[in-house]
């Protein structure tokens, strides 16, 4: 009974959060209800999360699951790095300390457009559907193309190995656009 309640709570939180965090919580909630990730503990019947680390989960961070990504910076320099399957492109830039000025100013909260990236056609076609929230932020980005997405919303998959993404020549922080609108 507590497992079902915990799963419902995780799914409800996923709807509120949206984006990658929401998708993760929804997935966790679905798994919690079906595989017993939440189990009753003690005489009071309180739910406590239990987690077992399988060999396959530990292997996720192995070099086999590392994806090579090439970023073409604003000045035309190519920055090549690796990221883990499931990491967002914002995570890849931050974790590898790539020198992309102002990238990810809002830390992936969909409050700016500084992680705006332009994708190759064959990669763009395989990306998950864009959300309304991401689309709203992209509307405020400079250099918008029909292959533009926000790096905080794109998670690496094996099919993206060796992809190249381009950082637009100019950057707009949507938070500044909103602030300017409020003061005038």
Swiss-Prot record:
Which terms are listed as keywords in the entry? Answer: 2Fe-2S, Acetylation, Cholesterol metabolism, Electron transport, Iron, Iron-sulfur, Lipid metabolism, Metal-binding, Mitochondrion, Phosphoprotein, Steroid metabolism, Steroidogenesis, Sterol metabolism, Transit peptide, Transport
Q: What is its main location?
A: mitochondrion
- What does the UniProt entry say about where the protein is found? Mitochondrion matrix
Q: Function, please? A: Essential for the synthesis of various steroid hormones. Participates in the reduction of mitochondrial cytochrome P450 for steroidogenesis. Transfers electrons from adrenodoxin reductase to CYP11A1, a cytochrome P450 that catalyzes cholesterol side-chain cleavage. Does not form a ternary complex with adrenodoxin reductase and CYP11A1 but shuttles between the two enzymes to transfer electrons.
Give the stretch annotated as transit peptide in the record, renumbered to this chain. 1-60
* Protein name in the entry: Adrenodoxin, mitochondrial
Biological processes annotated in GO? cellular response to cAMP; cellular response to forskolin; cholesterol metabolic process; electron transport chain; hormone biosynthetic process; P450-containing electron transport chain; steroid biosynthetic process
Gene3D superfamilies membership: 3.10.20.30
Kindly state the tissue distribution recorded for this protein. Highest levels in the adrenal gland (at protein level). Also detected in kidney and testis (at protein level).
The UniProt annotation places [2Fe-2S] cluster binding at: 106, 112, 115, 152
Cofactor: how and how many bound: Binds 1 [2Fe-2S] cluster.
Q: Which cellular component, as a GO term, is one annotated location?
A: mitochondrion
Please give one Gene Ontology molecular function term for this protein.
iron ion binding
Q: Which Pfam families match?
A: Fer2
How this chain assembles, per its entry, is: Interacts with CYP11A1.
